[in-house]
Amino acid sequence: MELELRFFATFREVVGQKSIYWRVDDDATVGDVLRSLEAEYDGLAGRLIEDGEVKPHVNVLKNGREVVHLDGMATALDDGDAVSVFPPVAGG
């Protein structure tokens, strides 16, 4: 199946595009996608996953819903889903 992956801020700089289309197995989960991104892009290695979960302060959304409110890393994906990945944001 094919997903649209959307990147923001520093993650967009690493990937070099604001969105890409990514082919995954039909039974892929959010965790599978994040692991494959860390393997594909050196600048993302160690920045998405910590202790088997989405790293604290990183926001991952499936079709606009935060995956921490779904099934986390085990969130199932469907063909055509949009997965958005936001780096930690600080402000004042």
UniProtKB/Swiss-Prot annotation:
Name this polypeptide is given: Small archaeal modifier protein 3
CDD domains: Ubl_SAMP1_like
Glycyl lysine isopeptide (Lys-Gly) (interchain with G-Cter in SAMP3) cross-link site: K18, K55, K62
Function of the protein: Functions as a protein modifier covalently attached to lysine residues of substrate proteins. The protein modification process is termed sampylation and involves the formation of an isopeptide bond between the SAMP3 C-terminal glycine carboxylate and the epsilon-amino group of lysine residues on target proteins. Seems to be able to form polymeric chains with itself at Lys-18, Lys-55 and Lys-62, similar to ubiquitin and other ubiquitin-like proteins. SAMP3 appears not to serve as a proteolytic signal in the cell to target proteins for degradation by proteasomes.
InterPro entries registered for this protein in UniProt: Beta-grasp_dom_sf, MoaD_arc-typ, Mopterin_synth/thiamin_S_b, SAMP1_3, Sulfur_Carrier/Prot_Modifier, ThiS/MoaD-like
Posttranslational modification: The C-terminal glycine is likely acyl-adenylated (-COAMP) by UbaA.
PTM annotation (Glycyl adenylate): residues: G92
Superkingdom to which the source organism belongs: Archaea
Molecular function GO labels: nucleotide binding
Coiled coil segments of this chain: none
Assembly, per entry: Monomer.
NCBIfam families with a match to the protein in the record: moaD_arch, SAMP1
Keywords noted in UniProt: Isopeptide bond, Nucleotide-binding, Phosphoprotein, Ubl conjugation, Ubl conjugation pathway
Mutant phenotype after disruption: Cells lacking this gene grow similarly to wild-type in the presence of either DMSO or oxygen as the terminal electron acceptor; thus, SAMP3 is not needed for DMSO respiration, suggesting that it is not required for molybdenum cofactor (MoCo) biosynthesis. tRNA thiolation is not affected.
Gene: samp3
Upregulation: Up-regulated by the addition of dimethyl sulfoxide to aerobically growing cells. These conditions also increase the levels of SAMP3 conjugates in cells.
